[in-house]
Amino acid sequence: AERVAEYQNDNSSLMNTALNVESIVYDSGFPLATKYALCGFISQRKDTFVALGTHEVGGLKLTASEDNSLAVALRTRLEFYPESDYFGTHVMRGMVVGRSGKIRSSQFQERVSPLYEVAVKAARYMGAGDGNWKAGKNFDGAPGSILDYIYDISVPYTSVTVRNRDWDAGLNWVQSYDLRSNFFPALKTVYNDDTSVLNSFLTALAICELNKIAERAWRYYSGVSYLTTGQLAVRIDNFIREAVNGKFDSRFVIEPETYYTDADKARGYSGTTKIKIYANNMFTVMTSYIQAFRMSDYSAT
């Protein structure tokens, strides 16, 4: 808790993103006080994400109601760190996962958060040495959403009423997929607008990476005086386009635009880069119904 508190200090050496390249911290089952402290991981740097679990290692199995109460508390703490006061953007670089289970084929017998599953699959999808997301390793939707490593889920069934309540609280849960398997119906951030693409865990992580790329572009061109403002804008945009080429498994359309505000022009030494990301919404709700006809009606068509 003491170490992670340094992320709230903008004078800490942890703000040196050239050397401290971490993007995400996973809650491995810390006590509540430490979970609260982990929320500060995203307080200063916009290239970071925190994934929290309701489970505490060594603690009792929680009920669905207890999971929900903890999720509300954790989401409230995360809301201390909005994305932008200027634009009024609420926090989205955080996620809360409920329930607990055991690790399959492991000597570690304590219960753990299903975040263990998320961490393993995220590393396999997004953790390559070249930084490119691996096609075929995504875990949004089956088969990737089906749990491979965690079993004996603490709350194996979540009713519709409870699911709606958990969703409103920003809580992710695990439920039955078939007779043998469980799955994540979705992995949503704590962002408070269900219609926004910022609800998606993967989209949020892409935005974290885009913030890293933008800072690398600044490091590359900082101090340049041999380019006109127009030439510099083109160079910065091309730098970003090259950096994102092939990175995100063809999931997004990304458009950088460097321009100069009136304040930039007056100063003469600054510019503004806007990076647009176009992403798909998560599919989470399906309405279905059955229509019955006479066979003769089919034959007639």
Which residues fall in each region the model found?
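Compositionally biased, low-complexity/repeat regions
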Residues: V234, N245-T301
